[in-house]
């Protein structure tokens, strides 16, 4: 099943919250998730000239703002993070940013998807060409929910998977290797455990 780029939000079996972002791609498979600094993970093309072929393939996919983690499939990562930094409540920052940026104006009207995570709360959101939704999500140990740009752009308990792994690295590998979803390219995880732990693959 091909669902394109997607987010996985949940808790490890030990009860630590996490979000993983995975790039799955048919058109631009030569990309990598790179930790840019203590607060940022970016999706970058392996060949820099590819950056000019499509405006949607290079972006920050993770931003940490204080005790808040933002993960998305595009440049709205920075917009959401900036609004939170300015003091907007998480729900409002998500709503404003998704409505302002809107879906991607490519051949597929690709949705923008987002997760905002703290130690105690989690939100998922998306905007498509026909819908926008923000929802606070209750997390349970050992369970996770996925939100994707194709075939699974919904926030529902029906999109649940069990994720194994105790560390950010193990969770990232699990999501990268998850065979149900095709065309894995790269992934990044934020795990909330004694602060934030970042991992990429």
UniProtKB/Swiss-Prot annotation:
It catalyses: IMP + H2O = 5-formamido-1-(5-phospho-D-ribosyl)imidazole-4-carboxamide. Signal peptide: none annotated. Its EC number is 3.5.4.10. HAMAP family: IMP_cyclohydrol. Catalyzes the cyclization of 5-formylamidoimidazole-4-carboxamide ribonucleotide to IMP. Belongs to the archaeal IMP cyclohydrolase family. This is IMP cyclohydrolase. It comes from Methanococcus maripaludis (strain C6 / ATCC BAA-1332).
């Amino acid at each position: 099943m091909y669902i394109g780029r997607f987010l996985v939000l949940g808790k490890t079996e030990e009860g630590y919250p996490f979000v993983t972002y995975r790039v799955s791609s048919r058109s631009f498979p030569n990309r990598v998730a790179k930790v840019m600094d203590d607060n940022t993970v970016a999706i970058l093309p392996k060949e820099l000239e590819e950056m000019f072929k499509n405006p949607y393939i290079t972006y920050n996919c993770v931003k940490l703002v204080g005790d808040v983690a933002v993960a998305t499939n595009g440049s709205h990562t920075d917009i959401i993070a900036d609004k939170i930094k300015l003091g907007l409540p998480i729900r409002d920052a998500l709503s404003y940013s998704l409505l302002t940026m809107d879906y991607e104006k490519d051949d597929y009207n690709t949705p923008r998807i987002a997760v905002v995570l703290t130690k105690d709360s989690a939100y998922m959101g998306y905007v498509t060409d026909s819908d926008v939704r923000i929802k606070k999500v209750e997390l349970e140990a050992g369970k996770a929910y996925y939100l994707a740009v194709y075939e699974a752009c919904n926030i529902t308990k029906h999109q649940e998977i069990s994720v194994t792994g105790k560390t950010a690295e193990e969770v990232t590998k699990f999501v990268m290797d998850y065979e149900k979803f095709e065309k894995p390219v790269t992934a990044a995880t934020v795990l909330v455990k004694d602060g934030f732990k970042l991992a990429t693959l």
